[in-house]
């Protein structure tokens, strides 16, 4: 029986290790594995009658968020997403389940980070092949001439994937034992490969978020030994990006010409198509594009009728076609492509204040660590790395996915498990111990 339980625990740990893989190839199995892990975690907690793992501020934070979503849903007219909203608590379970396994499986962190490292290399070479030949390793065509998607196929989120998981590479670099020289070199190489993948993806939002993230880390890495290469890294990014834009008409058009036209050229075909003439005359420039400006006007019309608790979570797609809200036939989409605007529309002032306070807390923790650094006091690099992730992902003036999208929610909540894990360790560096060759098939 003990052998069976050990095997079961290892299989469940393997599911956690495979999460970055299933973020790419199967959202169904991504959620399925997380549900199995969470169910197993809850069975263990109930059997042992030990609920101390839930004694975190995150529990209060998530409970507040969950109650807010329920209230917004109950007072809304749209009831299409009742199952999705009721089961939203599962994301908190995912966090605590992963935290539990991190604390109880000695080498899980090592396996997880090594898996991620291998994935970054595979995605880099696959992206190059797709960019050069038009097909990737498994025959998937390039999405557009300027949109390399690798294994994501017709879903252009490769850049978003790299940006969201890039901080884990930095965590790996921070905590890896310095004696693992080969692994250290490979991590550094993957860090340098990352902006190339993001750039080839053609995702302008991901490129901006990556630059913003690097600027954030630049303030904290100036006094750290393991990240002394950060200055050379910034120069490398600027020179390589500039050189590529200069030599590629396709990417210059994507990143420069299209961006300038979508924001400042009222006569651009796309801008005239998305906004009625009376709305075009109101703007000297567009926030991101005329299409997004349309969503803003439509969203604000919805908000005016649902100020306190909004129109309900995930409701924009259902209410945007209402004649009282839309400004033309192009006013509808599945979401409004901005977390803050989505919070304001779908959860009202209460939800908007909630996300604002969350972001202010991130800034507060960041400033606290920065002051510690200036005074020469100890501060947690791993905490700073994760704060940098949320500082950029919740940056207000960006085009985003839906905050309630399952894939997006998983990726947004995942770092919290690691944040709580490192917080409990109360140390700057966790030297990964290399397991025996029989057990570790991933360590280099």
Where are these regions (language model features)?
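Transmembrane signal-anchor hairpin modules in multi-pass inner-membrane enzymes, especially those
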Residues: 1-83, 100-110, 114-117, 172-185, ...
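Loop-to-helix entry and N-terminal half of a specific, functionally important transmembrane alpha helix
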Residues: 11-19, 57-66, 186-192, 334, ...
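A membrane-periplasm/extracellular boundary helix in multi-pass inner-membrane enzymes
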Residues: 125, 200-201, 221-283, 297-305, ...
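Long extracytoplasmic/lumenal interhelical loops at the membrane interface
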Residues: 142, 280-347
